Amino acid sequence: MGPDAKKQKLEGVDHLQNGFPVTRFLAWCEKVGLELNPKVYISTEGTVSQYGMLAREDIADGELLFTVPRSAILSQNTTRIQELLEKEQESLQSTSGWVPLLISLLYEATDSSSLWAPYFGLWPELDPPDMPMFWSEEEQTKLLQGTGVLEAIRNDLKNIEEEYNSIVLPFITRNPEKFCPMKHTLDLYKRLVAFVMAYSFQEPLEENDEEDEDEKDILPPMMVPVADLLNHVAHHNAHLEFTPECLRMVTTKSVHAGQELFNTYGEMANWQLLHMYGFAEPHPQNSNETADIQMVTMREAALQAAQTEDDRLEMQKRWDFLCHIEMVGEEGAFVFGLEEVMTEEELKVSLKVLCMSKEEFAEYKENDGWEEDEGDDEQTLMIQEISHLPTPWRKLLHLSAKLTLKNYSTELSMDEALVNNITAYAKLSSREQRSLQVKYGQKRILHQLLELTKS
């Protein structure tokens, strides 16, 4: 599901069609009514990574690539244990909302008589993508320090273990006729979490329902055969459409014979792609690249800049107030894209509050953060406009960016030299290459911030 680097080109691309797992899977597709356009085929040759879909001949914009009937989708509503899951639904509530699907996968993926057995056969032993959560702790720390991925995967692993021990294992124990703790283990559960993370789809809510729905009503994930074989790039050429009867993959631009068909997983930065899917787009292909400055790092910068103990106490008061009005949080981040600030309101309000005079803050606090409409609140803050922010704001942002860069184990110049040296880059392992792409993209944005905020 994700690019390491271009593999072999199109010589012998059809050889996989004769391999038993894919032949069996394609026969299954026909049996369940999953229709593929004859202009496309599934292969591991000529794709950016693992399985992928390529064009046999030219395909027009808007052309249907395949349809997946709802009955072929694997979800908590289509599994053979659907009634059991419904009966136990109260005990299967979790923060992730994934437990019913994961239990469905535990059951279906370990039973050779499952309707979806040919689908699971594409991944022997259910080997997950090479996601950082499966790297050694030493490799995680060495390659991912400062990127945000390290904290994300440690949080994932903690939550997975807690979820398995507190919800899934008791369920398994209560249902010995279908499950076995020796078979449906924590290790298998982790691999299936990675499987869902990398390959599942979430159906969007109807537009007219979005305002009424809260987070707990978000539709659960589901596994969509064939759709999950398409790789991702920011500049994709296909997208998935949802209808009451089926899901349809349709081209969004014309595709030439021999080219790969790409879906999109959304506007995702490289650190998110590496964390969730195990890959990163090579620079400069990912137009959705971002860099984060942790909100607590700005607090640290404000405290460092304070001249006296009274000033530090004042900064802490202001930070507490920003937390009170829910503008910042201990785990939040200010997000900077290639062209715009993604968290404009949070950034502007935080800089304003931390930099205003005592008198201004007293009045601002009295109004609980409300001000008269200044007329530009809805405008997007473009990256280049940061240089026009008030001087105190720029100084605080500059120090925040400097502190953020200190979290990385290497300098931008070292990363740049590696990325631009084809020979040296080729000698890196695939994990090193992907991690390098993440760090390089983030540091470029942070260094741009340093330039825009320098005095």
Curated annotation (Swiss-Prot):
The keyword Transferase applies. Pfam families: Rubis-subs-bind, SET. One of its GO terms (cellular component) is nucleus. InterPro entries: N-lys_methylase_SETD6, Rubisco_LSMT_subst-bd, Rubisco_LSMT_subst-bd_sf, SET_dom, SET_dom_sf, SETD3_SETD6_MTase, SETD6_SET. Its EC number is 2.1.1.-. Gene3D superfamilies: Rubisco LSMT, substrate-binding domain, set domain protein methyltransferase, domain 1. This is N-lysine methyltransferase setd6.
